[in-house]
Amino acid sequence: SSDLYIPALKGTDKERVTIEELLLHQSGIPAFWPFYKEAIDKDSYKGTFYKARPDASHHTQIDVRLYVTDKFDYRKELMAKSFSADYPLQVADSMFLHRSFRDSIIAQIGRIPLKDRRYRYSCLNFMLLKEMVENISKMPMNLFLDKEFYKPMEMNRTAYLPLRQFKKEEIVPTVKADYLRKGKVLQGYVHDESAAFMGGVSGNAGLFSTARDVAKVYQLLIDGGVYNGKRYLSRETCDLFLTHTSKISRRGLGFDKPDVNNSVKSPCTEEAPEEVVGHTGFTGTCAWADPKNHLVFVFLSNRIYPRPFDHKQLMRLNIRPRMQQVMYQALMK
């Protein structure tokens, strides 16, 4: 159960949530929680923070029917303009959060009331799994993954906090004017608010990579844990993650899967066999491993540039499944 690996959950209604429930998104934890609001000075803006329509104090559009207040500030004790031991969590250029904020997010998750145990996709599940990785490995997750997987697998273009290793010009910009980051261009900083306010390293978002590097991870999985002659995972672990499925949803452990009963709701093309595992991403990404045909399909785009609501056609027109379909149709010829 979760409290064995995350002491902060002891005594909360999350302490009996299992790792399997987190991986299947059946933990009962809500789909979303605006952690960043705790860092905002409530007295720095008038009225409500968000509005469905623009008005005199809400001009900045952040979604199809959502506008944010024009002016707000962060709490001075939580946000600084330069790095220090007390403010190490970089959210954007010249924006550093207090070190206590990361722990306060986990404490907040502990306090959020659980809902029923039906399937409910939630980033919070994977934020908790990241805490488990760190508490078991006794290392920050980015350093653990670097040491155990990315460096030995020569995934040289894969990193959390990529600006520590790469020039800004080498990184595709994610969003043009992020309202939580004072209208700055996000280039080399994670877009997802929860991951950003964790300092850029999270279980739900924050990893920068290339299609070639992502493919290596999926190749490792369908090759039973071996890559380039070296074993990284046991065959049993790979088999478990490739075959274990939920009894109440289409999901696998940590992975999404084709919906063989409902092609309209499926994240994959109809031609994809039920053995396929993978994931889609909010910023316009997807990666799928097909152990049956020994295929890996990776597609990376920056859908949310310049604005998060500009390219929703990627979903509406089913671009990712249709690209996958072309691949399977080519196999059948």
Predicted regions and their residues:
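Aromatic- and kink-enriched transmembrane "portal" helix at the membrane-lumen/periplasm boundary
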Residues: A8-L9
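Short, surface-exposed loop or secondary-structure junction motifs
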Residues: T12-E274
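Structured C-terminal helix/loop/strand segments within mature extracytoplasmic catalytic/sensor domains
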Residues: G225, H279-K333
